């Protein structure tokens, strides 16, 4: 196997990050073809968290992925905490018809509402806006903020929000919130070990599960989780480079059902990448592409 360290720059600061670093692992499939995995856990991760990222990277480096049931994957664009005048371009990037707007961070509630409204207006009729609070609200704040953001989406010309991702930090808070709002709730940060999804389901804490390949230990680990629940799955990125995104695409292509656009459009956030041609959506979809690693 071959190991190549990388450090790539983001075009837009994302949750305080301006770059991503890690190691690419080059391996060989059973058929003798090259395969690549990405190991890029965040600096504050624990040894057990890092081990799952390592397992996912080694799985990818052996090309050990399930057979696909679809050729292409509908994805969402992403709007981080940026000024409202940058929202329209980011929201409509790559022809996406769904956008995820980051909320509850450094911006005020009013700024979040302006960005949601601008994103909705940029997509127009038939577009979908989801928001992601990364667990930044308590239950009462979430009720108040979601009321305002639902109104903002309607001012932008849509029927409301598609869903809210991880509005509160704990599973118990998500369950409480779900009983108080009509906005569908997707669990993301609450799902970081294979046992988490069933705890979310048992608590009645979510309508949708967000699965990320690297944090959960690989594509096959995610497939096993999906088999255990009847809740719809959204495959999302852990701010991977294009090499890591290929694992997300492999999962999304293999799932029997994929009713929502996946959160795999994050390649658009990178100024530099680990491949020659960054994986970004075209006409709102991603397709697997040949490896063209440049690091």
Predicted features along the sequence, with ranges:
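Short helix/strand-capping turn motifs
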Residues: 257-268
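N-terminal capping/lid subdomain adjacent to the active-site entrance of alpha/beta enzymes
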Residues: 1-130, 134-143, 147-155, 258, ...
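Residue-level detector of functional hotspots within protein domains
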Residues: 61, 87, 195, 229, ...
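Short linear motifs at secondary-structure transitions and domain/linker junctions
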Residues: 1-4, 51-55, 160-161, 184-185, ...
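Catalytic core of soluble alpha/beta enzymes
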Residues: 103-246, 250-252, 269-281
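A structural signal for the main folded, soluble domain(s) of proteins
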Residues: 62, 67, 74, 183, ...
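Conserved beta-strand termini and adjacent loop/short-helix elements that scaffold enzyme active sites
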Residues: 6-8, 78, 188, 236, ...
């Amino acid at each position: 196997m071959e190991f190549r360290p990388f450090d790539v720059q983001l075009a837009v600061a994302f949750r305080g990050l301006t770059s991503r670093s890690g190691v690419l692992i080059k391996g060989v499939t059973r058929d003798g073809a090259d395969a690549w995995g990405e190991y890029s856990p965040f600096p504050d991760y624990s040894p057990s968290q890092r081990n799952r990222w390592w397992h996912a990277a080694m799985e990818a480096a052996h090309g050990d992925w399930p057979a696909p049931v679809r050729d292409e994957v509908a994805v969402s664009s992403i709007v981080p905490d940026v000024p409202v005048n940058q929202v329209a371009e980011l929201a409509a990037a790559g022809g996406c018809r769904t956008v995820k707007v980051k909320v509850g961070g450094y911006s005020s509630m009013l700024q979040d509402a302006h960005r949601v409204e601008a994103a909705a207006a940029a997509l127009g009729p038939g577009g979908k806006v989801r928001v992601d609070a990364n667990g930044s609200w308590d239950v009462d704040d979430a009720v108040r903020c979601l009321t305002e953001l639902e109104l903002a989406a309607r001012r932008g010309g849509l029927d409301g929000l598609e869903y809210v991702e991880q509005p509160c930090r704990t599973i118990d808070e998500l369950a409480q919130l779900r009983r108080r709002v009509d906005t569908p709730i997707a669990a993301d940060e609450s799902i970081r070990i294979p046992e988490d999804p069933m705890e979310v389901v048992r608590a009645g804490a979510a309508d949708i599960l967000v699965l990320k390949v690297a944090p959960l230990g690989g594509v096959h680990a995610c497939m096993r989780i999906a088999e255990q629940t009847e809740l719809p799955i959204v495959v999302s990125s852990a701010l991977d480079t294009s090499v890591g995104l290929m694992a997300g695409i492999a999962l999304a292509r293999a799932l029997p059902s994929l009713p929502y656009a996946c959160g795999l459009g994050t390649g658009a956030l990178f100024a530099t990448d680990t491949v020659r041609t960054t994986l970004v959506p075209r006409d709102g979809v991603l397709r697997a592409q040949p490896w063209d690693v440049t690091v």
